[in-house]
């Protein structure tokens, strides 16, 4: 019979695409392409809604539980981290507090939670290395283990 349980969760917030799509002009910069492709107003709206109904309550619960001895493994998509940095630094601060707890293990996940490993394995490896450094930049901690999107590897 198991005497210990570890909970693993991934925090991911996708970005919404503009509909209808906007044409991308010739010679567009990366910033121009982002403005044409993604609906940032909708992204912010959904982010704030999910933060209030899910991320804050879940983080409060996880903090209470790990302080009581529960062990938690948690991973973050870069998509989520970028949105949290821009729209809710206080929420990111709560996650930093959680990740800093000794009962919490930081897990590396594919940065944008996609299936790039099916298309380009060297790019996947490069992005996973980059993700490791991004997590260190945000949390001051590098993951020792990784997960792939939906554990498909």
What spans do the regions from the language model cover?
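Catalytic alpha-helical scaffold of carbohydrate-active enzymes acting on polysaccharides/glycoconjugates
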Residues: 1-144, 151-153
């Amino acid at each position: 019979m198991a005497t210990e349980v570890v909970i693993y969760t991934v925090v991911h917030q996708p970005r919404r695409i503009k509909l209808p799509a906007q044409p991308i002009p010739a010679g567009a910069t990366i910033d121009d392409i982002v403005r044409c492709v993604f609906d940032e107003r909708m992204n912010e709206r959904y982010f704030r809604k999910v933060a209030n109904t899910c991320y804050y309550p879940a983080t409060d619960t996880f903090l209470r539980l790990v302080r009581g001895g529960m062990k938690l493994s948690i991973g973050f998509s870069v998509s989520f981290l970028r949105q949290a940095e821009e729209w809710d630094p206080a929420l990111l601060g709560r996650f930093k507090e959680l990740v800093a707890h000794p009962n919490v293990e930081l897990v590396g996940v594919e940065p944008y939670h996609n299936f790039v490993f099916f298309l380009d394995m060297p790019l996947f490896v490069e992005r996973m290395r980059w993700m490791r450094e991004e997590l260190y930049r945000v949390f001051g901690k590098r993951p020792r283990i990784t997960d792939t999107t939906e554990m498909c590897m």
